[in-house]
Amino acid sequence: WSLNDYLGLANHPEVRKADTEAAAQYGAAYPMGARMMSGHTKYHEQLENELAAFVMKESAYLLNFGYQGMVSIIDALVTRNDVIVYDVDGHACIIDGVRLHSGKRFTYKHNDIESMEKNLQRATKIATETGGGILFITEGVFGMRGQQGKLKEIVEMKKKYNFRLLVDDAHGFGTLGKTGAGAGEEQDCQDGIDVYFSTFAKSMANIGAFVAADKDIIDYLKYNLRSQMFAKALPMIQTVGSLKRLQLLRDNPGLKDKLWENVNALQNGLRSKGFNIGDTNTCVTPVYLEGSVPEAMVMVNDLRENYGIFLSIVIY
């Protein structure tokens, strides 16, 4: 009940076989170098090309970690003259990436269109004065609440305000959209996302991440992402293993169908029993409880010890 393994790929026999064979052939260390030096292989390039095609972008670039990658992407995309506008409920990697920004930044109320517009107006005024641009950041799926980001409405606002849209779709990739390409595909606005980011830690049941965008943006990021320039390339076990995972995700829509069968059964069952799961419209299923932390811990322990159900609590 607390796992990231949305599609069940972690224990899929073909995945385990691919991981085992990659480990036997390459070990844990290879390649011994950064991508810009000696760490580039045909498998890294193949995975990037397949990921870009899957999420309908021109180019993609592999990242060693999701959290670290997003922090570095934000740092690379803006200068002190630029303005960042982002959702107040953004993931920690977004918040920490924004903290590195030496220019102005504004938060808007969670998924609130009116608040978005108000802050875009403020950002536009400042960017006009500084000669900079605006980076707008949101999530495809908010991992605590389970709501989709209002991507379609945000993309529509690009007609009125001049900004670049960065979307963290960690929970949408593989779970939403006709082909599993994420929240942008689900909302029919994938083309309007300028910079698309996702991790391998959810649907792909692996370690690593990627960013996808137009080729000129990716070429720029390759030489400006400090988290990648000064780190080894993604190991071969993760790279080759991710190729197999992506193949299974792409070629087996039944994986996503089964996920949603389970999600609907769970969410409908919880609602029918009177549990408050908010207004989630994704696989993320929060159960909001009133009471104290000690009471919540008693419930968690009871479910684990007496019912064989393991879950976690999140405290605000």
Model-derived regions, located:
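Conserved PLP-binding catalytic core of the aspartate aminotransferase-like
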Residues: 9, 257-267, 272-306
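Conserved core segment of the aminotransferase class I/II
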Residues: 195-197, 204-253
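Conserved N-terminal alpha-helix of the aminotransferase class I/II PLP-enzyme fold
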Residues: 17, 24-65
